[in-house]
């Protein structure tokens, strides 16, 4: 399959930055609480919870911490008030940015997100103004060093399970799926004992935009940094070709 992937540039992965600051477990804990509230504590019957558990393991969260989080959420369902919100906006030179957040105070989050755009000389847009520029895809990243299979064998497992595309990068493999097929592919890889660096449904830009103006780059980076530093922000997607 074609090696077209630019996954390192697709999404500023908040979890990588937050891991260094000790925040990732708190973020995942929120996601566990919401997933349990929406679909129950059994990951076999709760697609979202299974995704969060995969993310937790990829970030080295201990199994007992995951289990405690699930049990706590199951016994505290009525007090889980977090909700998902999405914002769309423009960075310098029209760079498209989509922000996913999980918050217990939408007014606070909206204010912080708006401020991040403004400080980087960007602006918030209306819902739907940019989402058509991205494709929603299941995306699984596999570390070559952690995987014992060769590329051909791994590709066949993924494609047989319903994957749309497979790409080999310098130090990793990427599997792309339709969102509806994501869980089938993830389970197929998991059953083969294949370690996944990340496994999630994400937004992939259809086209990328290159910035050459240093001021524009500085302003865009400011916006992205402010968004990633916000505890409510779960993911930031953009079409900047870094």
Regions found by a protein language model. Give the residues of each.
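Positively charged, low-complexity, intrinsically disordered RNA-binding extensions
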Residues: 139-242
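N-terminal cationic and glycine-rich segments that engage phosphates or anionic surfaces
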Residues: 1-125, 130-141, 238-241
């Amino acid at each position: 399959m074609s090696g077209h992937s630019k996954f390192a540039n697709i999404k500023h992965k908040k979890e990588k930055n937050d891991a260094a600051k000790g925040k990732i477990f708190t973020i995942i804990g929120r996601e566990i609480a919401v997933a349990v509230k929406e679909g129950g504590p059994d990951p076999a019957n709760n697609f979202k919870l299974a995704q969060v558990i995969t993310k937790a393991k990829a970030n080295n969260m201990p199994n007992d911490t995951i289990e405690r989080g699930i049990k706590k959420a199951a016994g505290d369902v009525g007090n889980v008030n977090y909700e998902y919100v999405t914002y769309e906006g423009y960075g310098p030179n029209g760079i498209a940015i989509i922000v996913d957040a999980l918050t217990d105070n939408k007014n606070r989050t909206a204010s912080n997100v708006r401020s991040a755009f403004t400080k980087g000389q960007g602006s918030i847009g209306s819902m739907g103004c940019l989402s058509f520029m991205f494709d929603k895809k299941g995306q699984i990243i596999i570390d070559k060093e952690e995987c014992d299979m060769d590329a051909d064998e791994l590709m066949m497992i993924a494609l047989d399970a319903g994957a749309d595309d497979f790409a080999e990068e310098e130090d990793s493999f990427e599997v792309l799926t339709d969102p509806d097929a994501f869980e089938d592919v993830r389970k197929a890889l998991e059953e083969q004992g294949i370690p996944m660096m990340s496994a999630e449904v994400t937004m992939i830009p259809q086209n990328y935009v290159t910035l050459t103006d240093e001021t524009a780059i500085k302003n865009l980076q400011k916006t992205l940094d402010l968004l990633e530093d916000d505890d409510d922000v779960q993911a930031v997607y953009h079409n900047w070709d870094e």
